[in-house]
């Protein structure tokens, strides 16, 4: 299969500073992103991170070190069940829609913890709250 080519002028940081329209820009949002390892391939393929959410600050710092998002405001350390966390993601999306003429992100990566559903985790107690993060992802994406 032939690789699609997008006409995105470089360097991107200069375009962002000039606030030019970036028609054709490929974007994504990452929920439950841990240290951002799962997003590495997207970055390699010139996708741009609108927002990333991780519960643990130390994992989010690794993403920042690797410059996953263009804007510092794209990094959110928070609980995906909290409305404040969801609002931050939607604020970033709205900013990209206004400034860079995107309609919606091309990809939404949602990798909620699945320990409660794992056979290997049969000895742990009720994991209903953690398992409900799958539902939280679906509701947010709608």
Locations of regions flagged by a protein language model:
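Conserved active-site and SAM-binding loop architecture
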Residues: 1-142
């Amino acid at each position: 299969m032939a690789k699609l080519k997008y006409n995105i002028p470089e360097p991107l940081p200069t375009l962002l500073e000039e606030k030019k329209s970036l028609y054709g820009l490929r974007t994504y949002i990452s929920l439950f992103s841990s240290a951002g390892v799962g997003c590495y391939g997207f970055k390699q393929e010139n996708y741009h991170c609108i927002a990333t959410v991780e519960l643990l600050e130390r994992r989010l710092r690794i993403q920042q070190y690797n410059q996953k998002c263009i804007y510092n405001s794209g990094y959110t350390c928070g609980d995906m069940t909290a409305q404040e966390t969801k609002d931050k993601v939607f604020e970033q999306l709205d900013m990209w829609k206004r400034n860079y003429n995107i309609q919606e992100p091309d990809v939404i990566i949602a990798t909620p913890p699945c320990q409660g559903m794992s056979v290997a985790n049969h000895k742990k107690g009720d994991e209903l709250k953690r398992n409900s993060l799958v539902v939280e992802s679906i509701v947010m994406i709608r």
